[in-house]
Amino acid sequence: MGDALLYGQEFLINFNISNLLFDSKDLGINYFLNFSNINSNYVSSELNGVEGNQVEFVPKLNCKTGLDFKFKNFKSSLQYTFMSKQFTDATNSIESDLSGVIGSLPKYDVLDLSFSYFINNFEFEFGGNKLLDKHYFTNRATGYPGPGIIPSPNRNFFITMQYKF
């Protein structure tokens, strides 16, 4: 494709709030934030229409944040994800062709929530993914099962039971 320049910043904050506010082994509150801001551009290319374009599959913004709350045998987790628009080809095609193979990947956000209960060696968990029920896609397949976009799953819920030996 050519030569590209990528630069930006990424940081992770993982903060145990309960250690700061409470003196309790039964209570836990943890916050995390993982954020990146990446600028990516082709600085030279022998191909027409590529120089100056954003590098494909490199979103400008990527953010994941969440909060975990634990009290005795109970735990809940809330996680939010945001991903900015990105391109799937070096020409930065915005509109999809008929095959769906080229074109941009629109921005999306996702909210997940789960609740757990621990007793002896068992963990019981109930949760939901994609609670905002927004439809998005993160890939454009050129072959199987495509060609075309691969949509995200719909809002879903789960129940699990785990036993630790």
Question: How should these model regions be labeled?
Answer:
Residues 1-91, 160-164:
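Gram-negative outer-membrane beta-barrel transporters
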Residues 60-64, 110-112, 154-158:
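Transmembrane beta-barrel architecture of outer membranes
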Residues 70-71, 105, 118-119:
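Structural motif
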